A protein has these predicted regions:
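Acidic, surface-exposed loops and disordered segments
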Residues: 1-293
Length: 293
């Protein structure tokens, strides 16, 4: 609808940052365009003189799909990474640190004449998950090399799985994940609670999973919730995911050396940087997290 398109365009309005003008609200706006599990946007922001702290909003946690909050803390890392690139457009260097005392991510901001906006900053408003079949175009070697590099951070590396055999192995894991999740009533209820079945609901909440990203038609919420009980099955979801994976250029797996909150934040930063680089290449991406969930 025009109303939905106007709302989406407003949220994703390209920034007008200027070097020498510090605009904390614009930094936060760009941070909120980051990835988050079920698009829950589980963050709060505290503005201070020379820093912005990104804090977890546990009222938006997903206890069934994310019982240890690892996705939530990865989401904080994604938001921090966006803020780093937005800060550069304002002539600010950004030093990101995890604060275990309050489980927050502190972004320290300093004037730096050497930093400038990059094409990753421009990609922030373009990046989004696209959960439909892709066109099958292969990535060329320079793109692959840059994507792998974009997904590397201290103690985090990216593995690119590109062959048909590797895709089939991933499909097997995803299929088993779908079976475990979609036969779990608590998982289904939690997932459905975050789906926005029509533009009006998406505009009203400003969060959640829009049916548009997976090519679903807009339906009244009461009707869609009744229909989804019939159509959201392990077999159907497995077929959709298999089609999407086979049509893709490949699957990226982000591997962290450690498994704690600080490491989850770093993994989120690595993923977001990767996704921004992909968006700068006009490459579409989506999560396929069932195997780790």
């Amino acid at each position: 609808t025009d109303e939905y398109d106007n709302a989406a365009s407003g949220i994703r309005q390209p920034g007008a940052e200027q070097v020498g003008v510090v605009d904390a609200r614009e930094l936060i706006r760009h941070a909120t365009l980051a990835s988050s599990s079920h698009n829950t946007q589980p963050w709060k922001f505290r503005i201070q003189q020379d820093s912005i702290t990104i804090l977890p909003d546990f009222s938006r946690r997903c206890p069934t799909v994310d019982p240890d909050d690892s996705h939530l803390f990865k989401s904080l890392g994604c938001a921090a990474e966006n803020m780093v690139h937005a800060a550069a457009a304002q002539g600010l260097s950004a030093d990101v640190r995890f604060d275990p005392g309050e489980d927050g991510v502190i972004v320290l901001l300093n004037r730096d004449a050497s930093v400038r906006a990059t094409n990753l900053y421009q990609a922030i408003t373009k990046r989004q998950c696209v959960k439909t079949a892709y066109d099958g175009t292969s990535l060329v070697a320079p793109e692959l090399e840059m994507l792998e590099k974009a997904g590397e951070r201290q103690n985090v590396r990216t593995i690119m799985l590109l062959s048909e055999a590797q895709k089939d192995a991933i499909i097997d894991y995803v299929t088993r994940g779908n079976l475990a999740q979609l036969t779990d009533r608590a998982f289904r209820d939690e997932l459905v609670s975050w789906i926005r079945f029509n533009p009006s609901e998406a505009i009203r909440t400003g969060d959640g999973l829009s049916g548009r990203t997976s090519g679903q038609p807009a339906l009244p919420t009461w009707l869609a919730k009744w229909i989804i009980r019939l159509v959201l099955t392990p077999k159907g979801q497995a077929e959709t995911d298999a089609k999407n994976i086979r049509s893709s250029a490949g699957v990226a797996v982000f591997v962290s050396r450690h498994n704690d909150k600080a490491a989850w934040v770093e993994a989120g930063r690595a993923y977001e940087n990767f996704a921004l680089r992909a968006a700068s290449f006009n490459v579409r991406t989506a999560f396929i997290n069932q195997p780790i969930e």
